[in-house]
């Protein structure tokens, strides 16, 4: 068994933005400002697939895609002759991840359990995270020949494991 708790959301992501109905990758300049760049071909391919399933993303829509999920999951899969990979993380299905109201993406930074939307403050002192597109992760696993047993959000997983009963079972601990 391979268990990864809150690993996927910490993997590097590519930011993108739709400007004048064109997709741009967002980079960072020396002034710590986001600047539009020509998109990575793999990024563009994934976005086109998302738009073919969900419809066009609105103009000025910004989000992120984790291109390293596939090589990372491939690496994990290569360790298994048999067994399972259990990934626990924060995220959404593709439909919810790229919903029109989530037009600024999910990229956040955390410091002392507080969330911030600007990752350029206290660089090196904050954890940077982006939620996981569970649909994309599941698709990668199936493409690798893994059997998908199911997926749910971390909140639903913990609720199903009766996390709320821990305090009652072990008061004061």
Predicted segment positions?
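A mobile, often basic/glycine-rich helix-loop segment
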Residues: 3-48, 100-110
């Amino acid at each position: 068994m391979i268990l990864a708790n809150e690993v996927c959301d910490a993997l590097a992501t590519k930011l993108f933005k739709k400007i004048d109905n064109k997709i741009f990758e967002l980079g960072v300049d020396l002034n710590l400002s986001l600047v539009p760049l020509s998109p990575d071909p793999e990024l563009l391919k994934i976005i086109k697939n998302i738009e073919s399933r969900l419809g066009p993303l609105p103009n000025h829509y910004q989000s992120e895609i984790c291109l390293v999920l596939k090589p990372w999951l491939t690496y994990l899969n290569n360790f298994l002759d048999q067994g399972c990979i259990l990934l626990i993380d924060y995220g959404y299905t593709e439909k919810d991840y790229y919903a029109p109201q989530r037009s600024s993406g999910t990229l956040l930074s955390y410091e002392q359990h507080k969330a911030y939307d600007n990752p350029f403050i206290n660089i090196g002192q904050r954890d940077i995270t982006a939620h996981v597109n569970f649909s994309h992760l599941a698709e990668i696993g199936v493409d690798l020949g893994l059997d998908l047993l199911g997926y749910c959000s971390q909140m639903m997983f913990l609720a199903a494991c009766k996390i709320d009963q821990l305090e009652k079972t072990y008061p004061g601990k």
